[in-house]
Amino acid sequence: MLTIDHLTKTYGDKKAVDDLTLHIAPGEIYGFIGHNGAGKTTTLKACAGILPFDAGEIRVAGVDMKTRPLDGKRLLAYLPDNPDLYDYLSGIQYLNFIADVFGVDKDTRAARIRDLANRFVLTEDLAQPISAYSHGMKQKLAMISAWLHEPKLILMDEPFVGLDPVASHLLKEMMRQHCDRGGAIFFSTHVLEVAEKLCDKVAIIRQGKLVASGTMDEVKGNASLEDVFLELEENHDA
């Protein structure tokens, strides 16, 4: 579903992502773990087609994101850590705008918006301007917009930060359901307990370089993910 092959991205003389190779298969929830500045957000933005990169290839369902970026973007949704929505629109206007962009017909979008807004308890707020939304409400609206066109791949940057427990539980359910239907999810997180319970596979990145990846058992063995992460950090600092 998502193939990252020798990805390199440089800012000035610093390699934010250094020769990164990963493969996320259909049906997988893949966690991306690392400290702030490790290269997680840069990688996700490159995969989403909104950040040019210096070397390597990124393919979404076989579509090359460098040569066919529009075709690739139609197959995915990207949720940044701080959704930058159009504050002058109402919630429903924003969702209709997203549906228009992805060519979702009116009957289909109405049914999906109704279902998703009910699940996120946002129905009564859709008529309100986004400028009146709290951070948590904006996150929920962004999540509805991500699922609205039923993408094959969903990319998320720290999706659980700021969510209340009910919304967090719902998001986990929706992530699993999406992958059970053959989709894939690649998301960054610093909440190791969430990754340990939710992910089929994880990758750990440090200073732009991949230091561990694989199934949870392959990466952590009998230890906790937190122990493995800290041990890798200590080994690289030594």
PLM region spans:
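Conserved ABC transporter NBD signature motif
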Residues: 56-67, 71-72
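Conserved ABC ATPase "signature" region
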Residues: 96, 100, 108-125
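Catalytic Walker B motif of ABC-type/P-loop ATPase nucleotide-binding domains
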Residues: 154-158
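ABC ATPase "signature
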Residues: 213-214
